[in-house]
A protein has these predicted regions:
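Positively charged n-region of N-terminal signal peptides that target proteins for export
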Residues: 1-4
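Hydrophobic helical h-region of N-terminal Sec-dependent signal peptides
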Residues: 6-10
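N-terminal signal peptide c-region/cleavage motif recognized by signal peptidases
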Residues: 13-16
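N-terminal "mature-domain start" segment
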Residues: 18-54, 100-110, 158-176
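A mature extracytoplasmic/lumenal domain signature
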Residues: 29, 38-40, 46, 75, ...
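Signature of long, low-cysteine stretches enriched in small and polar/charged residues
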Residues: 35-59, 88-135
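Surface-exposed amphipathic alpha-helical segments
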Residues: 40-41, 85-98, 136-192, 200-205
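A short acidic-to-branched-hydrophobic micro-motif
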Residues: 57-85, 139-141
């Protein structure tokens, strides 16, 4: 799994040691597992996947002090939307009344996507990862609420994001696409660690 520690510097300041009580929750019907600090609330809803178009979705969420940890799984079956269209629209939605400070590739083993840091006009701050995988959009977000002191440790944000796993062992990239990423990232100690063609880690020689 890709390290995301360098993103945390743009998200929260130093804080106390990690809270106890985190547990992994597995959802085999949706091919993922993720850790939460408490039993997540699960809600059914809709998600706007394109302008004037919504799809069924599920939200798994926990609020702990001033941070909301959430996972959205939106159904893409039958939408005929490309990955770039899905991800670009998700970023557009996240950008409403907010500023995207960072937008770089993300990777969880062989599943590739995007990773963002977002600052809301209301003072909130979010760290988000987006993956279009097997006819679903997965959106994982840790959001620090506005006008409150950040009491959750950096390690909790890292723990949440790095706990996400796709449990069916699949990929959303062809072998050719993976080879292209590794070629761009050949300067890394292990080119397989590259997350995308525009991975900033791969541009540093």
């Amino acid at each position: 799994m890709r390290s995301i520690a360098f993103v945390l510097a743009t998200f929260v300041a130093s804080a106390p040691a990690a809270a106890q009580g985190w547990e992994e929750y597995s959802y085999p019907d949706y091919a993922f597992s993720v850790a939460f600090p408490a039993n997540p609330q699960v809600d059914t809803t809709t998600y706007q996947i394109a302008d004037n178009r919504s799809v069924p979705a599920r939200i798994y969420s926990v609020r702990q002090a001033n941070v909301v940890f959430s996972m959205i799984v939106a159904e893409l079956e039958g939408t005929n939307l490309t990955e770039s269209a899905v991800i670009d629209h998700a970023i557009k939605m996240l950008s409403q009344s907010a500023t995207v400070r960072l937008n770089i590739p993300a990777r969880i083993y062989q599943v590739y996507g995007r990773q963002l840091t977002v600052e809301g006009a209301d003072g909130s701050r979010s760290m988000v990862q987006l993956f279009d995988y097997k006819n679903r959009l997965y959106q994982i977000e840790a959001k620090a609420l506005p006008d409150q002191n950040v009491s959750n440790p950096q390690s909790d944000v890292v723990r949440f994001h790095q706990s996400l796993d796709f449990t069916d062992g699949g990929s959303n990239r062809s072998e050719e696409a993976v080879r292209a990423i590794r070629e761009v990232c050949r300067g890394l100690v292990n080119p397989a660690f590259g997350a995308g063609l525009d991975d900033p880690a791969c541009t540093v020689r």
